[in-house]
Amino acid sequence: METQYPKLIEPSKTRIGWIGIGIMGSAMVSHILAAGYSVTVYARDLRKTKDLQTKGGRTANSPKELGEMSDVVFTIVGNSNDVRSLLLGDDGVLSGLKPGGVTVDMTSSKPGLAREIYAEARRRDCWAVDAPVSGGDAGAREGKLTIFAGGDSEIVEWLAPVMKTMGIVRFMGGAGSGQSCKIGNQICVGSNMIGLAEGIVFAEKAGLDPVKWLEAVKDGAAGSAVMRLFGEMMAVRDYKATGFAEYMVKDLGMAAEAAMAMPGTALNKQLFTVMVANGDGKLGFQGVVDVIRRLNGLS
C-alpha cells in the first residue's frame, strides 16, 4: 500500500512537472498524462511540446515557474551539467518548489550530484529522488522500464502510483543509490554490446550469415536481453538510436570516475569513444559493431 505522504497521490489532485521530452521522455510523460494526471512541461524549444499539449499538457516558461506549478517534478535530460542547472540553478526547479515538493531525476547522472540535490532539497524542506531507468525507447513506449530509485524509501513508495505508469520501481537505498545502480547496469550493457559486436563480426568473417548465427545461439548460454534487443539490428546494420552512443561514453566515464580497477569497462569506453569520434555519437549503442568491423578490415 502506497505511503500517504503528504497526502495520497491522485491524478485529480497531484500536479506533475516534467523536463525532458527526447527519445524516451516524451513517451514516459505520455503515460502519466494517459493516467489522468495534470502535467506541466518545461522545454527550451516550446515547439517540442506541441504533441503533449494536444494530449492535455500545459507549459511553463522556466524551471522555476515549473516548480511553482508542481507538486512533483521529473527530469530526464542529457547529462549531469544539465541536471545541475535545471534543479540547482538560480532559476532552477528547487528555487520555485514549495515545501513538501519532490524532485525525481531520471537522467543517468553522477551519484554525488544526486546526493547534492537531495541535501539542497531537504534544506528547503523538500525531497529528492534519483531514479534513472533502463529499457530504452521500447520500454518507454510500452511502460515497461526498470526504474532504479534512490532516496527515502517512504517517498519512493509514495511516488509509486505515478512511477508505475512508466515501469517497475526498484528501491536501491539512500540518495545516489539509484544512480550507482544505473552505472553498474551500463557496465554490463556495454560489455554485452562489445561481446555481441565481436561475435557478429567473427561470424561474418568466418563466412556465416550473421542473422542465422544469431538464431542459432540466442537460446543457448550466449543469449541475453542485449542480444534480443540489438542483435538483429547489429547484423543488418540498423543503427537507429534507442539510446545515443555518446550517452554510453558518458555512463562508462562515470564508472571510470569511481577509481576502481575495471579493465574491461575501460576498454569498452575506448571503443564507444572511437564510435563518437567517427561522428556517430547520435547513433544507437549497436553502431559500435562498425568499430569492430573497421578493426577487422570490413567496410
UniProtKB/Swiss-Prot annotation:
Family, per entry: Belongs to the HIBADH-related family. 3-hydroxyisobutyrate dehydrogenase subfamily.
Keyword NAD appears in the UniProt entry: yes
Biochemical pathway: Amino-acid degradation; L-valine degradation
BP-aspect Gene Ontology terms: valine catabolic process
Lineage: Eukaryota, Viridiplantae, Streptophyta, Embryophyta, Tracheophyta
Catalytic residue list: 182
Reactions accelerated catalytically: 3-hydroxy-2-methylpropanoate + NAD(+) = 2-methyl-3-oxopropanoate + NADH + H(+)
GO cellular component: mitochondrion
Entry-linked Pfam families: NAD_binding_11, NAD_binding_2
Binding-site list for NAD(+): 14-43, 108, 250
Cystine pairs: none
Domain of life, per lineage: Eukaryota
UniProt KW keywords: Branched-chain amino acid catabolism, Mitochondrion, NAD, Oxidoreductase
Subcellular location: Mitochondrion
GO MF annotations, alphabetized: 3-hydroxyisobutyrate dehydrogenase activity; NAD binding; NADP binding
Enzyme class: oxidoreductase
EC numbers: 1.1.1.31
The protein's name: Probable 3-hydroxyisobutyrate dehydrogenase-like 2, mitochondrial
